[in-house]
Amino acid sequence: MSEDQAVSFEDRLVRVTEGEFEGWYVWQSDAFEQRAGPFYERFDADGRGIAAFRADLRHMNGGGFMHGGCLMTFADSAIFTFARHALGKSHAVTMNLSGDFLDSARVGELIEARGEVTRAGGKTIFVRGVATADGRPVLSFTAIIKKIGPRV
């Protein structure tokens, strides 16, 4: 996206108005996440970020289980939901993301991630989370995010 095409942060996050994820939000400007997910997000009553998507056949590997790369891509998206308040108006990138696969996920399951910021200071934010498939833990992950400048 060129600077002429840039839109504000608030314009990129769109509220879903129908379907299973009605009331959630999705990034309309992230073509990769749309293809990989799409991934949805919202905040609970306590202000904690939640990310989710419905497992589809295209998310599965040759063995019929969710591809590990899909889960890690989802985790990489979710960490920014968890860090939203710590990020403020800053743009950021993932410096490190590591995960431990705990179980497999299958077609039709609701994949949901919940997490928290464990430390935020200066330009670095540390995050951890767990992704579940229909409530069953499938991935635990930790990440380091680096702020790189204000959002357009």
Regions found by a protein language model. Name each.
Residues 1-152:
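Terminal targeting signals and extreme-terminal segments of soluble enzymes
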